[in-house]
Amino acid sequence: MSVSGLPFDDFRTLLRDLPGPDARALVAARERDAQLTKPPGALGRLEEIAFWLAAWTGRPPAVNRPLVAIFAGNHGVTRQGITPFPPAVTQQMVENFAAGGAAINQICVTHDLGLKVFDLALDYPTGDITEEAALSERDCAATMAFGMEAIAGGTDLLCIGEMGIGNTTIAAAINYALYGGSARDWVGPGTGSEGDMLERKVAAVEKAVALHSDHLDDPLEIMRRLGGREIAAMAGAILAARMERIPVLIDGYVATAAAAILKAANPSALDHCLIGHVSAEPGHLRSIEMLGKTPLLALGMRLGEGTGAALAAGIVKAAAACHSGMATFAQAGVSGKH
């Protein structure tokens, strides 16, 4: 998958011509499911997940090369005093991922998932969205193109996650711009903002959306003005996966905000995606509902870093294993329905 040129027009062209699911593979999966040694529907969402895998991969459900991709970026809006942690923590956590010391490392080992971490110019934070656009169109498009390379090594299930001090503020601004309501509807504690700091966070989101209000009718403009490098890269990765018919699991509040940009640009853009979990960040459930999705897990987590999507990958792998490994009634000599 490659994209020539940097303007948003390249991505608008891709978004207008998205591949759809494979109807024949879906029918074949449903037919096999009907023969397995269980009552119809007894595996609940596991059956739906197996059908989803078949429809998007075009083959019997299987997960052989799952990958977690984490995109890390820094944000100029942290200068507004909206988070208790300094931006240096983003780089420190990238190093922790590399050393195997983060929660995501343990989950990847547990579920046998690959892990890639993408450092997105951490020494050069985006513009402060309360004062200027986060990125130029050229930089935003280039970062989307970079994110598309997440699938270059090959994967058949992509888990999307992020790391970035200040990025729940970014996610709140994107959701506020896309869906309205009030800034307070979308702002939560993130890494621990409370009291006056939480109020500064609300004020920053209000100020940012007001500043850019004349340019918020275009989802890609929302992304470049209010987003960040990890937002753009995640959007690029999700889009690249769609073009290559790779199923995607989306992680938490920030990853869902990146996905929402694509959904706003094309209502079918997330048909190949499932939401891995609903986080404890207050705006996440509402943003998932706006996407018309139902999360696979609800564990009260709010870490980000791809952790919820990675845990959900274990469920997806189980769904594929049940579909492919269970015996049929005929094979097992079990009587079917009268």
Swiss-Prot record:
Kindly list the biological process annotations in GO that this record carries: cobalamin biosynthetic process
EC assignment: 2.4.2.21
Supply the HAMAP family for this chain. Answer: CobT (MF_00230)
Described by its record, this protein's role is as follows: Catalyzes the synthesis of alpha-ribazole-5'-phosphate from nicotinate mononucleotide (NAMN) and 5,6-dimethylbenzimidazole (DMB).
Pathway(s): Nucleoside biosynthesis; alpha-ribazole biosynthesis; alpha-ribazole from 5,6-dimethylbenzimidazole: step 1/2
**Residues making up the signal peptide according to the UniProt record:** none
TM region(s), chain numbering: none
Q: Which reaction does this chain catalyze?
A: 5,6-dimethylbenzimidazole + nicotinate beta-D-ribonucleotide = alpha-ribazole 5'-phosphate + nicotinate + H(+)
UniProt lists the family membership as follows: Belongs to the CobT family.
The cross-references to InterPro entries, in alphabetical order and at most eight, read: Nict_dMeBzImd_PRibTrfase, Nict_dMeBzImd_PRibTrfase_bact, Nict_dMeBzImd_PRibTrfase_N, Nict_dMeBzImd_PRibTrfase_sf
Q: Which GO terms describe its molecular function?
A: nicotinate-nucleotide-dimethylbenzimidazole phosphoribosyltransferase activity
Instruction: Indicate yes or no for the key word Glycosyltransferase.
Output: yes
Name of the featured protein: Nicotinate-nucleotide--dimethylbenzimidazole phosphoribosyltransferase
Q: Which residues form the active site?
A: E305 (proton acceptor)
Q: Which organism is it from?
A: Rhizobium etli (strain CIAT 652)
Q: Which UniProt keywords apply?
A: Cobalamin biosynthesis, Glycosyltransferase, Transferase
